[in-house]
A protein has these predicted regions:
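Structured, non-catalytic alpha/beta "coupling" segments that mediate domain-domain communication
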Residues: 107-108, 113-123, 330-361, 517
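Flexible loop/turn segments at secondary-structure boundaries
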Residues: 218, 242, 264-266, 277, ...
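Beta-propeller folds
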Residues: 2-317, 418, 422, 603, ...
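Cap/lid segment of the alpha/beta-hydrolase catalytic domain
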Residues: 146-150, 155, 362-485, 489, ...
Length: 653
């Protein structure tokens, strides 16, 4: 879909649903309801780093400043890019064609709220009265182009109960800066107030807006602003640094919930929207390992919790992700949702709760599954646990052992590996690629226990799982090491980077997006904004020496050593606060030294081994993901150029 439509879909989802952390591709998990992923960071380092001389051979080492090292990496990347300009342009043109072909699958979403319908048109948020919706009588409520905010994107929208105000959350595409803009709706909408650093917000009454403030990537305070009296007041403060606070209004608008969540535990407080000035009331005190969410209807609280045994629901064989469509009319008896897979564009369904009837609403020329096979496998890990794998390949492919294979892994925070639809996946399938998704421990595919068995002192389980998955794929004839590439992002970089050190012979190349590669130094620095919050995932090496040694045993940065490495391509934003550039420069610096040391010490039998490419692509700005559709397209084109080149593949199709 077009960028503006894509953002509007997410915005309106947030309008009526839980606050979804801004990720590249959100999906609804079917087993455990854990907190949306909060990204992480690596440790800054001193303004000097040891790097090798830029000459061809191994030279004496010298000190480089941070700026010198960054300049050196930018020069190296520019040289790589200039060598493959034609390849990159061909791939970009093909990508654009695929994006345009599948962007029209999801039309502009129209949401009914009370007597109005709200929708996006030409980058503006608009509304019409229900009786005038077909007559073209449209009010433009909000247009970012009229505001002095450069490179800001709309993240969230809330409409006041009487439709007199609209609160719009915006976030910079190049940093963590955010704000809430409150517009008074009249014949000529007027900006009533701008509140900086706002993360989440909800209307309790026609005039009272509750909101959270984000400081150093953390939300721990809740305020309200009374537009009738023009005053604000602090309502709630979370004292525990492991917890992140957001707001949600129940679908019947009776209660506003203050949700304080850590990686494994939650606590919910209620504010009665009929009496918004009364103190919040706790639902249930936090219990370690229990996450819960509260809804309300007809004087009953409905609590969705992870306490107890999970329940699984079967989907069609091809489906890999499920996303609920927002529906403000909570009394509706019809539920709308989307099913998709990495190679199947989203298909819209309607389910009647009264008639127990499922209707497919999306028209398809021909199901993708006809030309693409999905295979479900299980690999036996080191401790004999069976690990699921999902593989996609072209239906008529032969000699699969000689086809390129791109393996995806994540394995952290109880979050599933991303299996949402991406147009570039279809292009890869057309070119004969196979796509494999490894559902390793540490993720959430098989529930909370699956996550717990792959975090803190069990992180090695996820690494062993990944190794077992790759070995099984090769054993069954799905490609071979010389045609295998590994891809991950953010915290998934821990497992990918660990395998890169422990079993480099299993892959030919690796592509990482804003990866977390220095776990130990990050978790040893309590002054970084998210270190305390991350302790439930990685442990606390500050007070536990055994934890420190355990992290050191798998940390990608700590375990770089002279050996034959696969080629690697890393993308990072220059001002990314969650994964600072300085940490990745240090990683690249150490990796280059290990590669050079190994080249110098190679035996006669090893002289024929090709030197790996080590490339760092530093993007401007501070976004943890690509800041725009064009940026994303360019990044994917360059990353695919790297993969096609490293695996010796032709880009001319």
């Amino acid at each position: 879909m077009h960028l503006s439509t894509k953002y509007f879909l997410q915005i309106m989802k947030d309008t009526v649903g839980h606050c979804i952390d801004s990720k590249c591709s959100p999906t609804l998990r079917l087993y455990s309801q854990t907190k949306s992923q909060i990204f992480f960071h690596t440790k800054n380092f001193r303004n000097a780093c040891i790097v090798p001389s830029s000459q061809g051979g191994v030279q004496p080492w010298r000190q480089f400043s941070y700026k010198d090292l960054l300049k050196s990496e930018q020069k190296h990347f520019s040289a790589f890019k200039s060598n493959y300009t034609e390849k990159t342009e061909r791939l970009k043109q093909r990508l654009e064609a695929h994006y345009e072909k599948y962007s029209s699958n999801l039309g502009s979403l129209v949401i009914k709220i009370g007597e109005y319908v709200y929708f996006e048109e030409n980058g503006c948020i608009c509304r019409s009265r229900l009786e005038e919706a077909d007559e073209g009588n449209i009010e433009v409520l909000f247009n970012m182009e009229d505001l002095p905010f450069c490179d800001f994107l709309i993240q969230r929208i809330r409409i006041s109960p009487d439709h007199r105000y609209i609160a719009v959350g915006i976030k910079s595409a190049n940093s963590e800066d955010s704000a809430s803009i409150i517009v008074k709706l009249s014949t000529q909408p007027v900006i009533e107030r701008i509140i900086p650093n706002v993360f989440s917000f909800e209307w309790a009454t026609n005039d009272i807006l509750f909101y959270t403030i984000q400081k150093n990537l953390r939300c721990h305070e809740v305020y309200f602003y009374d537009f009738s009296k023009k005053l604000s007041e602090l309502v709630y403060t979370e004292q525990d640094a492991r917890y992140f606070v957001d707001l949600y209004c129940t679908k019947d608008k009776r209660f506003l919930t203050i949700n304080s969540n850590s990686k494994t535990t939650s606590e919910v407080w209620l504010i009665d929207c009929h009496h918004p000035f009364k103190p919040p009331v706790i639902v249930q005190q936090r219990t370690k390992g229990v996450i819960y969410h509260v809804e309300h209807r007809n004087n009953y609280l409905y609590i969705l919790t992870t306490d107890g045994d999970p329940m699984g629901y079967k989907l069609p064989a091809w489906a890999c992700s499920l996303e609920l469509e927002p529906h403000p009319e909570y009394t509706s008896s019809t539920c709308y949702f989307w099913l998709a897979s990495p190679v199947q564009p989203p298909i819209r369904f309607a389910y009647s709760l009264v008639e127990n009837k499922l209707i497919e609403l999306t028209e398809q020329e021909m199901p993708i599954a006809v030309n693409c096979h999905a295979v479900r496998l299980e690999a036996k890990s080191k401790d004999e646990i069976w690990v699921p794998i999902t593989v996609f390949h072209k239906a008529n492919s032969v000699e699969l052992h000689r086809k390129p294979l791109l393996i995806h892994v994540y394995g952290a925070y109880g979050t599933d590996v991303n299996m949402s639809f991406k147009p570039e996946n279809l292009m890869l399938i057309e070119d004969g690629w196979m796509l494999a998704y490894c559902h390793v421990r540490g993720g959430g595919e098989l529930g909370l226990a699956w996550h717990k068995d792959g975090c803190t002192t069990k992180k090695h389980n996820g690494i062993h799982d990944l190794k077992a998955c790759i070995n099984l794929l090769h054993k069954l004839g799905f490609s071979c090491p010389m045609y295998t590439a590994l891809a991950s992002l953010s915290a998934g970089g821990v497992l990918a980077g660990a395998l890169y050190n422990s079993d480099p012979h299993l892959i030919r190349a690796m592509v990482l997006q804003s990866p977390f590669l220095d776990v130990l130094n990050t978790m040893l620095d309590p002054h970084l904004p998210l270190t305390i919050e991350e302790q439930e995932e990685w442990g606390n090496p500050l007070v536990d020496e055994n934890c420190k040694e355990y992290i050191k045993s798998y940390c990608p940065y700590q375990n770089i050593r002279p050996q034959h490495y696969p080629s690697v391509f890393i993308t990072v934003s220059e001002n990314d606060q969650r994964v600072p550039l300085a940490g990745l420069l240090r990683y690249i610096c150490k990796l280059r030294k290990a590669v050079r040391d190994y080249a110098e010490a190679k035996t006669t039998d090893e002289k024929g081994l090709q030197m790996p490419s080590v490339i760092l692509d530093v993007q401007p700005g501070g976004s943890h993901c690509a800041s725009s559709w064009e940026d994303s397209l360019n990044q994917v084109a360059v990353q695919l150029t790297f993969l096609y080149n490293e695996l010796g593949l032709d880009t001319q199709k």
